[in-house]
Amino acid sequence: MDTRFHCVYLLTSLDPQCEGDFYIGYSVNPLRRLRQHNGELVNGARRTGRRGRPWTIVCCVSGFPDDRTALKFEWCWQHPTASARLRHTIDILTGLRRLPYAVATLHLLVRASLFCQLDLTLHIFESAFLQEAAARAEVFLARRRGAFAVGGGLQAESPRVGTQQHSQRSSSLQGQADGVVTPPLPALDSQGELQGASTAAALATTTAASHLLPPLTPSLLLHVENTTREAFEDAYLSHDRCLLLPSAGMGVVVGEAGKEDSHMSASAGTSCPYDVSLLSQAARAEWSNASFASDSDDEDTRRLAPYCPSAGSSTPSPQRVRTAASPALLGYRSEERAGDGVWEASPGSSVGCGAALRSFSSPPPPRESSPRSASRPPVCTGINASASLAVDAPHGDVTAACPSSPAAAPAPQPRIPLRFADYGEVDFARAHAEEQHRLHHGLLPCSLCALPLQPSCLVYCSRAPFCTLRCHLSCLAMWMLYAEAEAAATIDGTDKSPALLSHAPPAPISPLRRLIPSQPCPCPLCGVLLHWGSLVKELKKRVVVERRLHAVQRRIRMEQRWQARLAHIEPTKRSTGAAMRRRQRARVGAAAALAKGAGKVPGAASTVPAPTMHAGPARRDAPRVSSPISFGEPTLTSFAAAASCPSPSASLAALSPTSASPISRHNGHSNTVTATHTAAAAAAASDASLLSLTDFCEEDWLLP
């Protein structure tokens, strides 16, 4: 699965001599690509290297599922006259040049048949450039249609000027009757430019007066946001500071609230991809105006007071918690109002959920007399009216991006389930942790086929976690295709029931068979419209977020283990060093005691003959080395003193072969006892000297 960030960007030149020049390109990191175009980094484009520097980024379009789709968008934007998507509508822009031409092409391209089904996001960096270019394109189109002023008077370029003037007079009269004054179009010179100093106010007035271009208004599949380079980098390009990743302060330590689930709740606050604080606030805001009154007939049943329809309509969607998109309902429609005014949860609302979304304060039980359906809640009445919900209405020759009228929307407004009324941040984090635990153990079934789900291959509803729809990607595609076929059969007016279609001969399999839904479909559980492009985009976004969350958790665990290891090593080093020094002093003291017990007095020669042993010819002919006592050299006491000194030079001097020879000559014989004790003392002194030096270095490193 390709989870990279694909975008197509638009650059314009800041050079006064190249005003209006633009460049269109594709990149996975547009800010780095901008630095390459400006010469700060290598591998820039040839067109931007000759002239036009410095360049600035005006806007970019993201949300493409893969690089092929993004490259198609780039090629269509660069070659609109040769593109099959725009060749029939680009004729209206003939004669328009420079940046206004690129912006006008963008207005048409986002509504093309291929790209209007994708969940795209328009990131605007320089709104002034974009608005001015769009206004100039509007003025150009108004001039092409004959409604422009040259020298203060109207001039017709087509035989329909009379009809246009009549329509202008009618519109002006209608505006005066409605109390709205329609401002006139600004005057143009013979070159098609504005007379005098073109101000942003005049261009904005012209744009507001007549929308000849399809506007870039936010919709369900087109999101528009004004951002800066820093915010854009933090949100989409930085892996460590990505706004898709919940912040460290957002994490909830669930183990403090529930000790029984400490094995899975220790990291639930940092592993939840949702903003748990936003979810809890949305649930409280949804049920803040709802009050319960006890019923005199049944004290176990609580009646919901009249609910304000506009109470929770301004809560943002959890899938776009970090963006400036238009607010959306955190909807859910699995709880139906019965005839007696009691809200009861349908059995289908717990499909694929189980204990993952179980509230601590469970909703009140329904009355015994209240009817309860035994199957999933029926889909809204308008499931077959998908054409009226989101049909691509033509805008001239351009396909509009799924406009929907309020009358076509479902009558009942989706709501948050009652069990989430008392949910807090800890509850949402624990529910997500339990759901992930069931998912990785194969215990979470699909909501459509009931087969176990696998990680990273399931689709959630756009209102998750308030909607419990969890299903395979292929199952949802089949559901949406079946809904499209049913809607097409209803629109045609022919009787094409599933029973009749089952007896029909199977259609031949062809590579041109469409397997990807093109029309939105209501959710089987909550009734919210689901768009295929939006679902795929959210799936990839969730995969990226989960990977980054796992990486963050792994880094946190490694740091914790490293700190614990260091904390265990520090006292161990200190205690080990002290014990080694004590053992060293004990060895030196024992060697000195043995030497004194053998009768060796410092500064005096040995007069008692020691037991001798005859050596062979080789030993007899070997060179003899004088005893250190005969030359007045320091004895074992000096070795002990050298062992206590950390200086390596003194230790080496004490262990030199000329001054510390363990063999003494007495009447042609060797004193083996003295040699043995002296060798042991020399070894102890050598070990003591090196250990002293090592301990000194360790303490030096361990100093604060």
Swiss-Prot record:
For region Disordered, the annotated ranges are 157-180, 290-323, 354-378, 601-629, 650-671
Check the record and name the Pfam families matching this protein.
GIY-YIG
Lineage: superkingdom:
Eukaryota
Record-listed E.C. numbers: 3.1.-.-
SLX1-type zinc finger span: 446-526
Q: What are the annotated GO cellular component locations?
A: Slx1-Slx4 complex
Report domain GIY-YIG positions. Answer: 4-90
> What biological processes does GO assign it?
DNA recombination; DNA repair
Q: Which cell locations does it reside in?
A: Nucleus
CDD domains listed in its UniProt record: GIY-YIG_SLX1 (cd10455)
Necessary cofactors? a divalent metal cation
Does Transmembrane count among this protein's keywords? no
Q: Where is the composition biased (Low complexity)?
A: 650-662
Q: Which GO terms describe its molecular function?
A: 5'-flap endonuclease activity; zinc ion binding
Biological role stated in the UniProt entry: Catalytic subunit of a heterodimeric structure-specific endonuclease that resolves DNA secondary structures generated during DNA repair and recombination. Has endonuclease activity towards branched DNA substrates, introducing single-strand cuts in duplex DNA close to junctions with ss-DNA.
Q: Family per UniProt?
A: Belongs to the SLX1 family.
Q: What is this protein called?
A: Structure-specific endonuclease subunit SLX1 homolog
Source organism per UniProt: Leishmania major
